[in-house]
Amino acid sequence: MEKINYEEVGLKVGLEIHRQLDTKKLFSPVPSKLSDDVDFTFKRRLRPTMSELGEIDPAALEEFKKGRTYIYEANNELGDLVYMDEEPPRGPDEEALEVALQIAYLLNAKPVDEVYYMRKIVIDGSNVSGFQRTAIIATDGKVETPWGTVGIPTICLEEDAARIIETRDREVIYRIDRLGIPLVEISTTPDIHHPEQAKVVAKFIGDALRATRKVKRGLGTIRQDLNVSIKGGARIEIKGVQELDMIPVIIEREVQRQLNLLKIRDELRKRGVTPEDIKEEFYDVTDIFKDTKSKIIARILKKGGKVLAIKLPKFKGLIGMEIQPGRRLGTEFADRAKKYVPGIFHSDELPNYGITQEEVEKVRKLLELEEEDAFVLVAAQEEIAKKALKEVIIRAREAIIGVPEETRRALPDGNTQYMRPLPGKARMYPETDIPPIRITEEMKRRIKENLPELPQAKVEKYVKEFGIDKSMAQTIVDDERDELFEELIEMGVKPSLAASILAVVLKGLRKEVPIENITEEHIKGAFRLYLEGKIAKEAFEEIFKELAQHPEKTAEEVAQEKGLTLLSEEEVRKIVDEVVNQYIDVIKEKGMGAMGLIMGRVMTKVRGKADGKLVSQIVKEKIREISG
């Protein structure tokens, strides 16, 4: 696709970043950790209620229509009555509130005078109570970027949802260990006008969160959502963007999708089709496929299913049009139908999947299609097939109007997939169990006086004060090893060596061993051995490899087991003598030109057990002695 002029297409992007806080649960003194232990389960059915506006949210209504029962797994340690919705909430947790206020100040926001909790209706089963508690903590923050200022209108403190374990036909199993973990939600204004600008803003916010040292790390602890729109398109909410580097890719692909949907709309209008032309009429074409070679259809017919069809006037050639790499308008139709059937067939992709040209022609004839018309088939039990085709009809009508507002899921390749309609504003009503929380001037002053340093400022300080490479400083800060780095320097380790081990050696081991098993005490233990002259710096890598595999060991135990404790000078001289005697003729011929060869041979014998400088000094002495 040709390069997109984002200013011309009127790109607007807003970010929503959710990050778990590393404190107790928000409304109960239960530890905020995950567990695979299950001691008991309980069931719930959830129903939508009206908001304070007297309206029912469309996304909540769609979930209710699925008619699901929710089963919750819990254990005796984490299965608190608050989060089973059996007793009123306590709190909120003071530490979580203070961390949220720290984040607010780091993002140049103004804390509110009083915190009022609201209930946000959520009935997909992820909240036992059928709602999520959320409150605005601060407003009017901002992030400066090379493209301009991006506002942060709200910073909220809310509860995380239960985690999904299994989805069955009419049942969903959740585990409530994650339910109630404090979650800070940071929303920006839609003042982001370039994909790379979105990445810059997300990184700055991420840096501010990490600076507090009170946010959780690891898979599932951070969720980034995007709101993307273009001129003539629609606001699309994209959920679950995990990686920072994928943000520009996802935005670019969403712009591409909307531009192509607008092209399809324009072509449909040019062909003179209106939403009213797409009738909710289902044609039973089962007889055409009674002897079909299509395994999918044959299997369904054998179970008593049917093949139903709808006609889509003037859609020929457009259902198969690519709107994102590897995704077509037909994919959008299929995504909508997926709540009822695994997939659909459309005329732009047929003959295929065992469906023959002859069968296609028979369907076209039965539906009395004209040259520009298309059709969609669904094979399933009759009522299910009708429900699936109704979803396709809705999406086809939307295609004539343009881009529908939706909540979509980010896919690993940067594309997106339909999840549900965009939630309305009819989701909130006041939380009557939690009184307002006053943010006192004393609390504000105390938090402002103890704000942590932002990561970028720390990187610049390390480069200036310790003279280390900027990329090393960035790695140390990004890996949250900055406090450890400063402790090592206080222990007497040279900054250059500490930086090299933390940013190069440890980083290099990531693909080989689980370095997350290496604790700060392991690292400090290895450096103590080095400072005491017991190991060479070449031994760090071997020690860390072993500690990653066996974290129950100490650095000293590994050094002894692996024979990595330093050789005495006398032992080194003995090894050098052995190698020199082996290559004496080469030394006589080349003199100092044999230095590289001899050093290499000696180091293979003593690596990790002798200081490189000492080895070099002894080898030079020996070569000079022989070559005169």
From Swiss-Prot:
Family matches, as InterPro entries: Asn/Gln-tRNA_amidoTrfase_suB/E, Asn/Gln-tRNA_Trfase_suB/E_cat, Asn/Gln_amidotransferase, Asn/Gln_tRNA_amidoTrase-B-like, GAD-like_sf, GAD_dom, GatB_C_1, GatB_Yqey_C_2
Entry's EC annotation: 6.3.5.-
Keywords, comma-separated and alphabetical: ATP-binding, Ligase, Nucleotide-binding, Protein biosynthesis
SMART domains in the record: GatB_Yqey
A biological process from GO: glutaminyl-tRNAGln biosynthesis via transamidation
One Gene Ontology molecular-function label: glutaminyl-tRNA synthase (glutamine-hydrolyzing) activity
The reaction(s) this protein catalyses: L-glutamyl-tRNA(Gln) + L-glutamine + ATP + H2O = L-glutaminyl-tRNA(Gln) + L-glutamate + ADP + phosphate + H(+)
Pfam families: GAD (PF02938), GatB_N (PF02934), GatB_Yqey (PF02637)
PROSITE patterns to which the protein is assigned, alphabetical: GATB
Gene Ontology cellular component annotations, sorted alphabetically: cytoplasm
UniProt cross-references to PANTHER family, sorted A to Z: GLUTAMYL-TRNA GLN AMIDOTRANSFERASE SUBUNIT B MITOCHONDRIAL AND PROKARYOTIC PET112-RELATED (PTHR11659), GLUTAMYL-TRNA(GLN) AMIDOTRANSFERASE SUBUNIT E (PTHR11659:SF2)
Function recorded in the entry: Allows the formation of correctly charged Gln-tRNA(Gln) through the transamidation of misacylated Glu-tRNA(Gln) in organisms which lack glutaminyl-tRNA synthetase. The reaction takes place in the presence of glutamine and ATP through an activated gamma-phospho-Glu-tRNA(Gln). The GatDE system is specific for glutamate and does not act on aspartate.
Family: Belongs to the GatB/GatE family. GatE subfamily.
Subunit relationships: Heterodimer of GatD and GatE.
HAMAP family registered for this protein in UniProt: GatE
Protein name listed in UniProt: Glutamyl-tRNA(Gln) amidotransferase subunit E
Source organism of this protein record: Pyrococcus furiosus (strain ATCC 43587 / DSM 3638 / JCM 8422 / Vc1)
